[in-house]
């Protein structure tokens, strides 16, 4: 197989691990390497990745750096939030939702450069290997996939560092680099490893990089207004912005008020339990607001059906099935439900809390004060409720007459 692979597209961050993979691919597969670096809002300068790739012998024309922030938010994050997707009741899927976009870009570059394979730096223990590879195989099943962590014998930090030194790969650590295994994008930051491998141990205070500690948040609450169009956020406090700008603004507001920290143990697709800590400030606000606007614009049974289907939808994303018939079927249903999810939601942010204090929809609200008022009304005949209750109780009445006990 190795001799058949002449060109490989590598998901490349410019960091130590993927730089070692780059050199390993050149040596082990004797392949030409194409690098792809995605800007999905991780907050790092990406041009150093270009310089690093050049220093490792990658041709200038084989270095791809793409700004995918708006595509990430518009086509992936917003699509997911239309479903109110949460995995196992808590996780907002910040890492999971980024992987299909990266897989798609890898395949597009492989097709453009006539590459034989793609490669990634995900380990053989985690979910990301599944997400990258399911996505790639769905989009181009003819591409080979190289996962070095499943092949090489560089199975310790010491061996990796020795390999880097042997091949002249810069191993100087950035002064601000976290010792934790981190993943960052415009939706979240995740932390794994070190003290977090003990589920009973409290995370170190200096681990968190984004959301303020509650003791450091303002002592005054802040009221904001979010506007939705067909289920997607379109404005904050009346200001229209691009999808990436909207999420960035929500992140700023949420982080300021201590919103979005999470410490959970989740069930990985590969079978093991894993502890992760997450910061999702903007997503936490967005979820609350989206459910609030749905509460006045969605039909009851449509809303309940969405809630029943959501865990399946969330699991599909978590497990890597973004490019699958079943996810696309669910997405079509979800998107159909959002046609009338238009309006504004007012929220109060304070000390880690997101409180809905108002919601309105000029043309799509199903909330009728005339029907639900506690005052006298002329539209609802309360006598009708007697027949409604009797028909719904009919099975209980029949069972009771037959001596059934509940």
Swiss-Prot record:
Q: Which Pfam families match?
A: Arginosuc_syn_C (PF20979), Arginosuc_synth (PF00764)
Binding positions (ATP):
11-19, 38, 121
What are the protein's UniProt keywords? Amino-acid biosynthesis, Arginine biosynthesis, ATP-binding, Cytoplasm, Ligase, Nucleotide-binding
Residues the record lists as binding L-aspartate: 123, 127-128
Task: Tell me a GO cellular component.
Answer: cytoplasm
Q: What is its EC number?
A: 6.3.4.5
Question: Might you name a Gene Ontology BP term for this protein?
Answer: L-arginine biosynthetic process
Q: Which residues bind L-citrulline?
A: 91, 96, 127, 131, 181, 190, 266, 278
The top EC class is ligase
Q: Where in the cell is it found?
A: Cytoplasm
The record ties this protein, via NCBIfam families, to: argG, PRK00509.1
The cross-references to PANTHER family, in alphabetical order and at most eight, read: ARGININOSUCCINATE SYNTHASE (PTHR11587:SF2)
Q: Write the protein's name.
A: Argininosuccinate synthase
Species the sequence originates in? Campylobacter lari (strain RM2100 / D67 / ATCC BAA-1060)
This protein's gene is called argG
